[in-house]
Amino acid sequence: MTLVLLLAATIAFIVLATTRAGLHPFLALLIAAIGFGLLAGMPASDVITAVNVGFGGTIGSIGIVILAGSIIGTFLERSGGALRLAERVLAISGERHVPAAMGIVGWLVSLPVFCDSGFVILSSLNRALAKRAGVTLATGAIALSLGLYATHTMVPPTPGPVAAAGILDADLGRVIGWGLLISAIALLSGWLFAVTVASRVYIDPNEGEPEASQGTDNQDTNGSSPGALHAVTPILVPIALIVLRSVGRLPSMPFGEGGFFGLIDFVGHPVVALLVGVGIAFTLVQDDLRSRLGATGWVGDAIVAAGSIIVITGSGGAFGKVLQGSGIADVIGANLADAHLGMWLPFLIAAGIKTAQGSSTVSIITTAGLMAPLLSTLDLDSETARALVVVSIGAGAMVVSHANDSYFWVVTQLSGMDVRTGVKLQTLGTLVQGTVAATAVWLVSLFVL
């Protein structure tokens, strides 16, 4: 209980330091990580090691992806391609249905693509849509964020659900089937949250981007900007490559284990796939490409814009790693495991661990390990029950995304949100969506178990 209270105080410090005191989130998170570790009784050397490993590991896994995504987004915006693409999406969906379109796109993209990578890839499209429709950036950003999260935590082939299915000996096909159903229900709740709550928070889509990119719209009127199909290729090609890699890694090994599999496994890695997207984005420039590639050109501006996002995301990873090392996840999981809550138990354990240490994947895997020996006792050891337990764990792994979650910082920093707004929208949104998903799992279990 002491660790839980300490965590609550630490989160309050982060929020107050960044909103009231105006401290940069990077410093606030590092201070919080070190302070929590020391007050939790961790050896000082272990605290520093956890900070370094968490910071470096997070940047190592997503730093290049954020940089590449920033470059793609900058070229899309300044070439006029994002505007053309936004016009096309608006023509299909209509201005009133932009949040629904972003949510569905996120739900589909996150089936094979990590939610943070998907948000990086699609955030420039969301910004362009908000600018074109003249609406707040917050609505589409939260709809996209929650849409990505729905499938990321509940539907294979993302690593968390796959690992949980393996630990619990659940049939992967059943997990996919129930996961798709429950995540679709969660998607609907996320969309409703976006249009009823996030829409009340105005975030100017022209803010938070380099000044030079704000003149993008002018390029669209002179006929020099790329068409919508050309503009979407830097987004679709990386996604397609990542999808192929995920398919190739399925247990059935559809591409075999030879040279073709090796090629797909290489080009489908998120880093390589996004770099391919960067190369395609360069083709969006109609004239004077060379001047765009230097330190003072579009590439340089994109790297500068991404730098702040990367260090904040890395410090969020450092905070999460310290929490993992403190043992708070074990404390929460062990206490909840003694309760008798049926299908709600895996959700609550996963939610507690997720809230405590930030990583959805760690939450899913840890909870699956805790639940495995309890399934027979809880009468949840049938094939269908095991699959639903995996989905329930995934629902819990959404609750909640806050300051110790690197995805929280990706969403807030790419969407122009301060910490308080992020808590109001991203954190509360994941609470609503995860709870709705868990309720859906429970209701389904009443009829099929």
What residue spans do the PLM features occupy?
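Hydrophobic transmembrane alpha-helices of multi-pass solute/ion transporters
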Residues: T2-I71, R84, R88-I92, L241-S315, ...
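Juxtamembrane and boundary regions of transmembrane helices in multi-pass small-molecule transporters
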Residues: G173-D217, A395-L449
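Long, contiguous bundles of hydrophobic transmembrane helices that form the permeation core
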Residues: G177-G297, L449
